[in-house]
Amino acid sequence: GRVLLFFYICQQNINGIHEIMQNNLVIVESPAKAKTIEKFLGSGYKVLSSYGHIRDLKQKAFSIDIENNFKPIYEIPEDKKSVVSTLKAEAKKADMVWLASDEDREGEAISWHLFEVLDLDPATTKRIVFHEITKSAILKAIENPRDINIDLVNAQQARRVLDRIVGFELSPVLWRKIKPSLSAGRVQSVAVRLIVEREREIHAFVSETFYRVSAVFSDGKGSEVKAELGRRFATKEEARAFLESCVQAEFTIEDITTRPLRKSPAAPFTTSTLQQEAARKLGYTVAQTMMIAQRLYEEGLITYMRTDSVNLSELALSSSREVITSMMGDKYVKTRQFATKTKGAQEAHEAIRPTYMINETIEGTSQEQRLYELIWKRTLASQMADAELEKTTATISVSGTDDKFTAVGEVVTFDGFLRVYKESYDDESEQEDESRLLPALEKGQQLERKEIMAVQRFTQAPPRYTEASLVRKLEELGIGRPSTYAPTISTIQQRGYVEKGNREGTKREYDVLKLKGNQVTVTVRSEMTGSEKSKLLPTDVGSVVNDFLMEYFPQIMDYNFTASVEKEFDEVAEGKEAWTGMMKEFYQGFHPLVETSLAVKSEHKVGERMLGTDPATGKPVSVKIGRFGPVVQIGSAEDEEKPRFAQLKKEYSLETVTLEQALDLFKLPRTLGELDNKTVTVGTGRFGPYVRYDNTFVSIPKTMDPMTITLEEAEEMLRAKREAEAQKVIKTFAEEPDLQILNGRYGPYIAYQKKNYKIPSTVEPADLNLETCFKVIELQKAKGENRKARSVVKKKK
């Protein structure tokens, strides 16, 4: 028996040595990830990248065999053929192939496609997963390989096929009914619906006015007490009557209570909460956040960035405990494991956290450092003690009335997690800072009135969505998953259904009534209201497409239905439902709707709105979506005389433009004269009035009147335009529509979020990718900050 045991141990050791010495090929998705992993593995391992998916549905074909159980027809794209041939050659040389793509459904599908296309042998192929790129995680994964999880692959395939069916069948309907080259997507259409409905809510909102009363009292010992009245007044007269009743009134502390409060930290980051906080605290777009997080993950600095779990590993919990203890002491530690609330949370992921909690900072670009710091602070705070506060509430009675004032004081007695991190909100004004002390007060104490004010306020319309608040809403409704939030928000902007923009505020007057001494004074002040920055706004095309889909495809546009489809994908991922059965059920309900909508003949074109009659011709005036965007039309196609068209101005919308505004657009074009035997005209279009000459268009500035502009002025504008012709777009990026590489008067530059960044002369602008663009931006920002710092130093001298 002992001899057999000895031989068995020897054999195991030989097997282990063989595995170390053999030729191993590890395949991951990205070169950056490959580079990091290669550092952790020995010389027996070669790590190569597949550069994402190596096989997909054909881009311009339907590529689904409906009759053959919804079989997808895949192809290897032209730009991936050389990658595939390299991987095939290396796989043939390898004794063992390790498929190490990401651990989610998309990653599982990449591994499955690699297995199929490279024609790998199951006996010499292993699937490994990890949610952080650290040496211990990689070695542990190699010790615990598994097979490809076909349920996860099917869930990814189901999403891809279902979305292809919706896109390919719906888009031709939109081309025929609205305008050519439109496209529709399942989750995107529902996201557009949210934005359109919010815009209409805002337009329909009727603001109501009320008067809020606040007071400043003196305690007679040199301290002030600020308090608010418990009720609001509907009219100025009521507010004034109350203030006048306070002239002779006495103000007494009727009751005073002090109670302890505790505030607990937020859970560690999921994809959606990271996107929201990075938008609020750092001003990053959703796409930007994901791109930076991807780099941090691939460099082994944070865990996997697509997750809806708030769990932390035991190792993360213990290392957080050690860091908190060494930095702040035992009393700041409180180990917590948060419960994942999101329905259908995918796979056994962890929350997004630093791989090594001991690293408070990292090397890298300024953007990477800031996002890492945010993740580090949020993770650390989640494992810290509650903040302890003391809240004091004093009720102040007013003699001769039942009304009461309330004064509130709040003081932090132990900062706990607040020492490290404070969560942000979409509307910071809603989170009023009550951290103010009240002086020592006693029940029955008389207070002296200093002043009482009644300020006119207005009820607010709901705010427009930001990228961050839209992500939160989508998650709340159960629509989409961590991997889909960023692409959804990018796609609806690329398709021109939604645009990110600012709304200029309007000036509004409001009353302030003040009682000081025995006199009530009334003053009128003004404020700007309704101004918004970087909000998601529906375009006319987005609104019209939304209305059409709501009418003919209510199921596709239903929030609950979209969420239920996500749940079905989850069921497929868990092996509880066959993906083909899910497809069949969906298609049987969806396809007949497509055929019905194509067959319906409507009297008016979709989105058309009648404004009235043109007094000059007696013909109908309407607005609709034309081939190149929203237009005003005088007359109809049935008339002998062709209808006249004018492009709708950018500041007008199909839903709100008036007859008068529409008719004004027909006062142009007017002819100014000729230059070099070619006519110069003034016209108006989507973006306002312009001068046109030989297919050259120049916008007329707001300071000039298009009805009085002269030929000489137009000639000067055309000359300036020719000089500025260098303003040509060198490159744009679909995933970040706000960013462009342009050629300007002083050379090439990057235009991003209404700011320009010079491109160094050593760099070829056309070769820049999105990642290097952001590095150039960071570099220029840093230079700007250094210049500012130097100028401040000079001023101090």
Model region roles, listed by residue range:
Residues 22, 102-103, 179-181, 258-267, ...:
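Conserved short loop/turn motifs at secondary-structure junctions
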